[in-house]
């Protein structure tokens, strides 16, 4: 059996947690500190990931010197530095403004194309799901059950394309057709 080079999974959530006393590259390298990897190798990998997530030139910046989008990139880098096979993302861009969020969508699509990994992305934003996902699973309101599954057969990039706009409208209409929780009780 081949030896796995990366960790099985990593997470990235809406909580953009950075250690305020660490610079960006040290915050990214934090994900590797629990193992026996030498410090020089941890920093080498962290620097490579800093470049991958578009933070080249900001390696030595402290969190208070970074914008919200840049801190999101640090969090994404920390999730990627261990080379996970599965990346679990729980609304990682929900706190970002629309322009930064769109930029992060493009970055995630680019990174996904470069790395062979599965991404499980949780979002309440239908447009975000259409832009990022190859497969969408829509959940019902309480109790949460799979309501619909959709194979997204649209080429990347999708932002603003007619197919993405049409699928977003279709999925929103499907959500609006679900009876509200109040009507069912």
Predicted regions and their residues:
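Signature (C-motif/LSGGQ) region and adjacent switch/coupling loops
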Residues: 5, 25, 51, 59-62
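Hydrophobic anchor residue at the start of the ABC signature
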Residues: 12, 76
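Short coil-to-helix segment of the ABC ATPase nucleotide-binding domain corresponding to the Q-loop/switch region
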Residues: 22-30
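Conserved ABC ATPase "signature" region
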Residues: 33, 40-58, 110
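Conserved signature/switch motifs of ABC ATPase nucleotide-binding domains
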Residues: 61-64, 82
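Catalytic Walker B motif of ABC-type/P-loop ATPase nucleotide-binding domains
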Residues: 87-90
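Helical segment within the ABC ATPase nucleotide-binding domain
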Residues: 101-115
